[in-house]
Amino acid sequence: MTDILNLTYEELEAFMTAELGEPRFRARQVWQWLWQKCARSFDEMTNVSKATRARLAEKAVITWPEVETVQKSADGTTKFLLRLADGALVETVLIPSASREGTLRITQCLSCQVGCAMGCTFCSTGTMGFERNMTMGEILGQVLVARAHLGDSRPDHPILRNLVFMGMGEPLLNLNEVMRSLRTLNDEFGLSFSPRRITVSTCGIEKGLRELGESGLAFLAVSLHAPNQEIRKRIMPKAAHWHLDDLITALESYPLKTRERVTFEYLLLGGVNDGIEHARELVRLVSRTKGKLNLIVYNPAEGDPYDAPTPERILAFEQYLWSKNITAIIRKSKGQDIKAACGQLKASELQRGTASAGADAPED
């Protein structure tokens, strides 16, 4: 059976004509039902004939991720633990904000892999190891779940406004499925997200970086987190295989649209990378590119190897960057009371499962 959410529009058109003998326009109808109207069954597609719906049901399925757990923070952040068809667990987070007019807007943080191979020492997902890549249908299934949860059914006035590939996994290590997802997101008859409302975040992987830039399908964010190669090797051991200086050199010629800048994500770890000496090194790096900085205050979970920086060090770090004409914004951590940082909810769920299994095990 073909999972129809894994098909690009061109693939769906070929499937409808070759497998079902339908005219090409039928693919457009099905496509709009899948992505604009969030249909979970072929029976919902009321402008498609019953005979065609029956043939679709014989040869294809529509597989959404199943919602395993939902947690809502006091600040409105909502985190989902989703179960995929093979039982794998991934996370997605909805982060609320308000427009200047006070209208609710939601940013969704998307996962693209089950687990992660990068092994970043500050990240809960990194401690889980890598299981597999997610398919396009699984990646975009997170968006469908979010829209259904929000009752977001008006493409002309969407509640879900922005998407960030900053969840579980490294996007450039699942480049093919991420690029397929971006094309479907950009499709005006599909999910219809402007590239300016999508950001792909990478640890700094050489392979695929240029292809992403030349596609023009999304903005780029780089999870920098280290002002020099020594710290990069310590806290981001896999990413450090591509030397920090080489990464910045590649970003100097990264294709950018008018008024577009690379966003550097910098996680402030207490006593590790949050000193003025680190800020000086960071200025030298970022000033080589057309970029801006998002400063993220570390949100430690129980048993984590790092501490949050002090408010004094955070302020001094930010002020130094501004004094050197580097745009730096402190990004407030949301959802701290529901383990909203990447991988924390899944890690908690796995620990609970292990504890339950141990409690139920027969005694020797």
Swiss-Prot record:
Its cofactor is [4Fe-4S] cluster. Its EC number is 2.1.1.192. Its main location: cytoplasm. Keywords: 4Fe-4S, Cytoplasm, Disulfide bond, Iron, Iron-sulfur, Metal-binding, Methyltransferase, rRNA processing, S-adenosyl-L-methionine, Transferase, tRNA processing. It catalyses: adenosine(2503) in 23S rRNA + 2 reduced [2Fe-2S]-[ferredoxin] + 2 S-adenosyl-L-methionine = 2-methyladenosine(2503) in 23S rRNA + 5'-deoxyadenosine + L-methionine + 2 oxidized [2Fe-2S]-[ferredoxin] + S-adenosyl-L-homocysteine; adenosine(37) in tRNA + 2 reduced [2Fe-2S]-[ferredoxin] + 2 S-adenosyl-L-methionine = 2-methyladenosine(37) in tRNA + 5'-deoxyadenosine + L-methionine + 2 oxidized [2Fe-2S]-[ferredoxin] + S-adenosyl-L-homocysteine. [4Fe-4S] cluster binds at C116, C120, C123. S-adenosyl-L-methionine binds at G169, E170, S201, S223, L224, H225, N299. One of its GO terms (molecular function) is rRNA (adenine(2503)-C2-)-methyltransferase activity. It is found in: Cytoplasm. InterPro entries: Aldolase_TIM, Methyltransferase_A, RlmN_N, RNA_MTrfase_RlmN, rRNA_lsu_MTrfase_RlmN/Cfr, rSAM. Binds 1 [4Fe-4S] cluster. The cluster is coordinated with 3 cysteines and an exchangeable S-adenosyl-L-methionine. The keyword Cell division does not apply. Specifically methylates position 2 of adenine 2503 in 23S rRNA and position 2 of adenine 37 in tRNAs. m2A2503 modification seems to play a crucial role in the proofreading step occurring at the peptidyl transferase center and thus would serve to optimize ribosomal fidelity. Belongs to the radical SAM superfamily. RlmN family. Reaction proceeds by a ping-pong mechanism involving intermediate methylation of a conserved cysteine residue. This is Dual-specificity RNA methyltransferase RlmN. It comes from Nitratidesulfovibrio vulgaris (strain DP4).
